[in-house]
Regions:
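Long, C-terminal catalytic modules of enzymes
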Residues: 282-284, 288, 293-381
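Structural motif
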Residues: 82, 218-220, 299
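HKD-type phospholipase D/PLD-like phosphodiesterase module
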Residues: 2-212, 249-294, 303-310, 314-316
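Alpha-helix capping/termination and helix-coil
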Residues: 214, 218, 238-241, 245, ...
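Long, K/E/R/D-enriched contiguous segments that form extended
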Residues: 205-252
Length: 381
């Protein structure tokens, strides 16, 4: 789509300038959008660019398809990177789509690249990427790199890049990144295992342990799909006097039908853990994945509070020790809570900006049917 072409044109331009480009794409996304696609092959054909597919689709091993690459990040040299939960499609980038998902990522800038980098989040992320890239699960992109369509798309991407420069000149001006960022006490990368198989829940272990160390935790997640162990862990938090609140999409606004349907089935179990759930109703669906602990710790990345992110997918989160960042995200959370409803003492209470949206008859029937279908499939949603 248009957002994807924006990204590919920028990557191709960088390759033309001699930048070494490596792109790794999830297997199912690769099967649907990348393999044999002349737009991606135009990039992969460049001498300075490579595209690989993590866990490519193999119909002889359908059970392997469940393990997906869910990380989203961009590393530039040894100096800067951005990491979060945003996908590179019209729904997440630009102004191409009426329906949008609001997301959050962090930009990290190293002021002294190349020195004392051993224990930095930059070195941790570079090591993580290399391990994924060199994994036996990652394969080259398939397709003809010398075909007529590939050559045509190469020229189209070069032309498109020039059009973007004219349309958005401010985006191409040199920036003083140090002035645009602020210092933190520490940044640590959290991850799941990378093998394309059922995973030990490293990410959830880490998040739960960090929340247990605090007095209050706020969780942002687009949807909630918990298994028994995760329910037990949430109950353990509240039993130990950790105040936990979750901000998630109202069913009438959520963009993921599986997550919305599971919430209709499971919301009473969630409430019984003692957490307070804010069902967020805003102009756009929220895709943010973050955890705030007390007034110092902010954790942002790709992890959803669901069983897929916990047991199946690769995931990355940045744990940032910074009162300044925590205050920024907490201010956003307080604002979002005014657009939410929450269950208290058996009754819903409504934030001052919450506006009820009724589900259409068609959607009610759809969810009623789906509520029965998904019960045995919850782990894989």
């Amino acid at each position: 789509d248009e957002a994807g072409q924006d990204i590919l044109s920028a990557l191709l331009n960088a390759a033309d300038r001699g930048v070494d480009i490596r792109v790794i794409v999830d297997g199912i996304s690769g099967f649907m959008d990348v393999q044999h696609n002349p737009w991606f092959l135009a990039l992969d054909a460049h001498k300075n660019a490579q595209v690989r597919i993590y866990n490519p689709v193999n119909f002889l091993k359908p059970w392997d398809m469940q393990a997906r690459l869910h990380d989203k990040y961009l590393i530039i040299d040894d100096q800067m990177y951005t990491l979060g939960g945003r996908n590179t499609t019209n729904l997440f980038l630009g102004d191409y789509s009426k329906g949008k998902n609001i997301d959050k990522e962090l930009f990290v800038y190293e002021t002294d690249p190349g020195k004392n980098m051993q224990n930095t989040s930059m070195s941790q992320l570079q090591t993580y990427f290399d391990s994924i890239w060199d994994s036996s699960d990652s394969k080259p992109c398939r397709g003809s790199r010398n075909g007529k369509k590939t050559v045509e798309k190469t020229e189209a991407l070069k032309k498109h890049y020039k059009e973007l420069q004219k349309k958005y000149p401010a985006a191409y001006e040199k920036q003083n990144w140090e002035e645009l960022t602020f210092e933190t006490n520490k940044i640590t990368l959290l991850s799941n295992p990378i093998e394309s198989e059922n995973k030990e829940p490293w990410m959830w272990y880490s998040l739960h342990r960090l929340m247990m160390s605090g007095k209050q935790a706020t969780i942002y997640t687009p949807y909630i799909i918990c298994g028994r162990e995760m329910y037990d862990d949430l109950s353990q938090l509240t039993d130990n006097n950790v105040s936990v609140e979750i901000i998630t999409n109202d069913v009438a606004k959520g963009a993921n039908p599986w997550g919305c349907t599971d919430y209709l089935n499971e919301k009473e179990k969630i409430w019984r853990t003692g957490v307070k759930v804010y069902e967020y109703m805003a102009p756009h669906s929220c895709h943010t994945k973050a955890v705030l602990i007390d007034d110092r710790m902010s954790i942002v990345g790709s992890y959803n509070l669901d069983m897929r992110s916990t047991y199946l997918d690769t995931e990355l989160m940045l744990a940032v020790d910074s009162t300044e960042l925590n205050a920024i995200i907490r201010k956003e959370a307080e604002h979002d809570k005014t657009f939410s409803k929450t269950m208290e003492n058996g009754k819903y209470t409504y934030g001052e900006n919450y506006k009820t949206k009724e589900l259409s008859t068609g959607k009610k029937l759809f969810y009623a049917t789906l509520r029965q279908i998904i019960k045995p499939l919850r782990r894989f949603l």
